[in-house]
Protein backbone atom coordinates (compact mmCIF):
# COMPACT_ATOMS: atom_id res chain seq x y z
CA UNK A 1 0.00 0.00 0.00
CA UNK A 2 1.61 3.25 -1.17
CA UNK A 3 1.46 6.04 1.41
CA UNK A 4 0.22 9.47 0.33
CA UNK A 5 2.13 12.31 1.99
CA UNK A 6 0.05 15.31 3.02
CA UNK A 7 -0.05 18.07 5.58
CA UNK A 8 -2.40 18.00 8.55
CA UNK A 9 -4.47 20.63 6.74
CA UNK A 10 -4.83 18.39 3.69
CA UNK A 11 -5.81 15.42 5.84
CA UNK A 12 -8.40 17.48 7.74
CA UNK A 13 -9.81 18.86 4.48
CA UNK A 14 -10.29 15.35 3.04
CA UNK A 15 -11.75 14.04 6.32
CA UNK A 16 -14.26 16.92 6.40
CA UNK A 17 -15.30 16.23 2.80
CA UNK A 18 -15.75 12.53 3.60
CA UNK A 19 -17.83 13.35 6.69
CA UNK A 20 -20.06 15.68 4.65
CA UNK A 21 -20.56 13.04 1.97
CA UNK A 22 -21.49 10.37 4.52
CA UNK A 23 -23.53 12.51 6.92
CA UNK A 24 -25.28 14.91 4.54
CA UNK A 25 -25.04 14.14 0.84
CA UNK A 26 -25.55 10.36 0.99
CA UNK A 27 -28.76 10.58 3.10
CA UNK A 28 -30.05 13.47 0.96
CA UNK A 29 -29.66 11.52 -2.28
CA UNK A 30 -31.47 8.52 -0.75
CA UNK A 31 -34.42 10.83 -0.07
CA UNK A 32 -34.21 12.16 -3.65
CA UNK A 33 -34.31 8.59 -4.98
CA UNK A 34 -37.30 7.68 -2.80
CA UNK A 35 -39.15 10.83 -3.86
CA UNK A 36 -38.45 10.18 -7.54
CA UNK A 37 -39.43 6.51 -7.17
CA UNK A 38 -42.82 7.57 -5.79
CA UNK A 39 -43.55 9.38 -9.08
CA UNK A 40 -44.19 6.09 -10.86
CA UNK A 41 -42.66 4.39 -13.90
CA UNK A 42 -38.90 4.18 -13.37
CA UNK A 43 -38.06 3.53 -17.04
CA UNK A 44 -38.96 7.05 -18.10
CA UNK A 45 -38.33 8.81 -14.82
CA UNK A 46 -35.47 11.25 -15.50
CA UNK A 47 -35.52 12.52 -11.92
CA UNK A 48 -34.98 8.97 -10.62
CA UNK A 49 -32.14 8.24 -13.05
CA UNK A 50 -30.44 11.57 -12.23
CA UNK A 51 -30.64 10.83 -8.50
CA UNK A 52 -29.20 7.33 -9.01
CA UNK A 53 -26.34 8.80 -11.06
CA UNK A 54 -25.69 11.35 -8.32
CA UNK A 55 -25.71 8.52 -5.76
CA UNK A 56 -23.11 6.60 -7.79
CA UNK A 57 -20.86 9.69 -7.92
CA UNK A 58 -21.17 10.19 -4.16
CA UNK A 59 -20.39 6.53 -3.43
CA UNK A 60 -17.41 6.65 -5.78
CA UNK A 61 -16.03 9.75 -4.06
CA UNK A 62 -16.58 8.18 -0.62
CA UNK A 63 -14.58 5.13 -1.71
CA UNK A 64 -11.82 7.32 -3.18
CA UNK A 65 -11.53 9.48 -0.05
CA UNK A 66 -11.67 6.48 2.29
CA UNK A 67 -8.79 4.88 0.40
CA UNK A 68 -6.76 8.10 0.33
CA UNK A 69 -7.23 8.72 4.06
CA UNK A 70 -6.32 5.10 4.86
CA UNK A 71 -3.04 5.60 2.97
CA UNK A 72 -2.39 9.12 4.31
CA UNK A 73 0.98 9.89 5.82
CA UNK A 74 0.61 13.19 7.67
CA UNK A 75 3.92 15.02 7.57
CA UNK A 76 4.96 18.12 9.47
CA UNK A 77 7.53 19.72 7.15
CA UNK A 78 8.66 22.11 9.90
CA UNK A 79 10.06 19.15 11.85
CA UNK A 80 13.07 18.45 9.61
CA UNK A 81 15.87 20.22 7.78
CA UNK A 82 15.33 21.31 4.19
CA UNK A 83 18.91 20.84 3.01
CA UNK A 84 17.53 18.91 0.04
CA UNK A 85 14.14 19.03 -1.68
CA UNK A 86 11.50 17.14 0.34
CA UNK A 87 7.77 17.26 0.98
CA UNK A 88 6.96 20.76 2.23
CA UNK A 89 10.11 22.39 0.80
CA UNK A 90 9.79 25.78 -0.86
CA UNK A 91 12.12 25.72 -3.84
CA UNK A 92 13.26 28.55 -6.11
CA UNK A 93 14.34 27.27 -9.52
CA UNK A 94 15.52 28.87 -12.73
CA UNK A 95 14.78 27.59 -16.21
CA UNK A 96 18.23 27.43 -17.79
CA UNK A 97 16.83 28.11 -21.29
CA UNK A 98 14.60 31.11 -20.53
CA UNK A 99 16.30 32.28 -17.29
CA UNK A 100 12.82 32.56 -15.75
CA UNK A 101 12.73 32.03 -11.98
CA UNK A 102 9.84 30.21 -10.32
CA UNK A 103 9.06 29.32 -6.73
CA UNK A 104 7.20 26.13 -5.80
CA UNK A 105 6.24 24.45 -2.55
CA UNK A 106 5.83 20.67 -2.66
CA UNK A 107 2.52 19.55 -1.15
CA UNK A 108 0.26 16.50 -1.13
CA UNK A 109 -1.78 15.46 -4.15
CA UNK A 110 -4.95 17.01 -2.74
CA UNK A 111 -3.30 20.30 -1.75
CA UNK A 112 -1.97 21.63 -5.04
CA UNK A 113 -2.79 25.25 -5.86
CA UNK A 114 -0.71 26.65 -8.70
CA UNK A 115 -1.88 30.21 -7.97
CA UNK A 116 -0.07 29.94 -4.62
CA UNK A 117 2.87 28.03 -6.10
CA UNK A 118 1.83 24.79 -4.35
CA UNK A 119 2.52 21.80 -6.59
CA UNK A 120 1.69 18.17 -5.97
CA UNK A 121 4.59 16.00 -4.92
CA UNK A 122 3.39 13.62 -7.66
CA UNK A 123 3.83 16.21 -10.44
CA UNK A 124 6.66 15.65 -12.95
CA UNK A 125 8.60 18.73 -11.87
CA UNK A 126 8.31 17.86 -8.16
CA UNK A 127 9.40 14.27 -8.79
CA UNK A 128 12.43 15.56 -10.70
CA UNK A 129 13.41 17.89 -7.82
CA UNK A 130 13.07 15.43 -4.93
CA UNK A 131 16.37 14.82 -3.17
CA UNK A 132 18.21 17.54 -5.08
CA UNK A 133 20.25 20.24 -3.32
CA UNK A 134 20.92 23.94 -3.95
CA UNK A 135 22.99 24.33 -7.12
CA UNK A 136 21.86 21.01 -8.59
CA UNK A 137 20.52 20.89 -12.13
CA UNK A 138 17.66 18.65 -13.18
CA UNK A 139 15.75 17.90 -16.34
CA UNK A 140 12.03 17.33 -16.63
CA UNK A 141 9.83 16.42 -19.56
CA UNK A 142 6.97 18.92 -19.78
CA UNK A 143 4.17 19.21 -22.37
CA UNK A 144 6.28 21.79 -24.23
CA UNK A 145 9.27 19.43 -24.29
CA UNK A 146 12.23 18.75 -22.04
CA UNK A 147 13.44 21.63 -19.88
CA UNK A 148 16.49 21.97 -17.66
CA UNK A 149 16.39 23.81 -14.35
CA UNK A 150 18.77 24.75 -11.57
CA UNK A 151 17.79 24.87 -7.90
CA UNK A 152 18.66 28.30 -6.52
CA UNK A 153 17.34 27.89 -2.96
CA UNK A 154 15.50 25.48 -0.69
CA UNK A 155 13.80 26.43 2.56
CA UNK A 156 10.70 25.86 4.63
CA UNK A 157 7.82 28.30 4.77
CA UNK A 158 4.57 27.54 6.62
CA UNK A 159 1.74 26.61 4.25
CA UNK A 160 -1.02 29.20 3.93
CA UNK A 161 -4.20 27.65 2.63
From Swiss-Prot:
Alphabetical keyword list: Coiled coil, DNA-binding, Transcription, Transcription regulation
Cystine connections: none
Coiled-coil segments on the chain, per record: 45-73
Keyword Disulfide bond: no
One GO BP: regulation of DNA-templated transcription elongation
Database matches in Pfam families: GreA_GreB, GreA_GreB_N
Entry's Gene Ontology molecular function annotations: DNA binding; RNA polymerase binding
UniProt similarity note: Belongs to the GreA/GreB family.
Function: Necessary for efficient RNA polymerase transcription elongation past template-encoded arresting sites. The arresting sites in DNA have the property of trapping a certain fraction of elongating RNA polymerases that pass through, resulting in locked ternary complexes. Cleavage of the nascent transcript by cleavage factors such as GreA or GreB allows the resumption of elongation from the new 3'terminus. GreA releases sequences of 2 to 3 nucleotides.
Name listed for the protein in its UniProt record: Transcription elongation factor GreA
Organism: Campylobacter jejuni subsp. jejuni serotype O:23/36 (strain 81-176)
Originating gene: greA
Amino acid sequence: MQKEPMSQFGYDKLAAELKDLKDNQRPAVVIEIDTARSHGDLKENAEYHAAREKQALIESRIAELSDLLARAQVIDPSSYEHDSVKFGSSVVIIDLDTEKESKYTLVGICEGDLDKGYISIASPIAKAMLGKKEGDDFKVRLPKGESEFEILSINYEPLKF
